[in-house]
């Protein structure tokens, strides 16, 4: 299946781009979707798996800890939290983002395996990630692996695994896009359902 799209990178190398600038670029370019790809970490080297987040409030301590780590590089301060609360409360993309996150999480879970077993599915979660605030489109943050887990780190170093991650993300994006009215996914000659 071929999904025709234009990918706009907020960065293509390891240079830092402020979290707020990433969403601002997506808005400026009038992107249809925003995907932030991250590597998780934990104090336990045994932690592993995948999880996908969308922007909203949470009382889940684990989700808050992940958001705190990711938000640590933000230019926002605690005193600006009230504005953050207002932005989230006014967001009309929360439900769309939750559905988008579910499609991404399902695809990652179905397509990524650790050896002979699937990666643990840590689920779809909500958290106040600065990088997702203000997005004018459905937006998610995918934690694709734990960099703090030596086995997962080793897999991430292989081009084959990174390609599988990219393909799983792509499949999740296509699955979500197909649920939207008016979106047609182009098919290649070899894909199922393509005209003869």
Per-range role (PLM):
Residues 1-196:
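Active-site-proximal helix/loop segments of hydrolytic enzymes
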């Amino acid at each position: 299946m071929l999904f025709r799209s234009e990918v706009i990178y907020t960065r293509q190398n390891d240079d830092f781009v402020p979290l707020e600038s990433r969403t601002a670029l997506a808005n400026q370019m009038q992107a249809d979707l925003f995907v932030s790809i991250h590597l998780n970490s934990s104090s336990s080297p045994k932690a592993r798996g995948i999880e996908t987040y969308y922007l909203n409030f949470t009382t889940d301590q684990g989700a808050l800890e992940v958001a705190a780590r990711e938000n640590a590089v933000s230019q926002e301060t605690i005193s600006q939290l009230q504005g953050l609360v207002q932005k989230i409360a006014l967001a009309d993309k929360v439900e769309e983002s939750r559905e988008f996150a579910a499609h991404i999480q399902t695809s990652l879970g179905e397509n990524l395996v650790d050896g002979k077993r699937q990666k643990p599915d840590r689920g779809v979660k909500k958290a106040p990630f600065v990088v997702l605030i203000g997005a004018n489109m459905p937006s998610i943050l995918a934690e694709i692996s734990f960099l703090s887990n030596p086995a997962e780190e080793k897999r991430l170093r292989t081009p084959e695994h990174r390609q599988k991650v990219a393909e799983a993300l792509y499949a999740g994006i296509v699955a979500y896009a197909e649920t939207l009215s008016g979106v047609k996914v182009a098919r290649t000659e070899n894909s199922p359902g393509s005209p003869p």
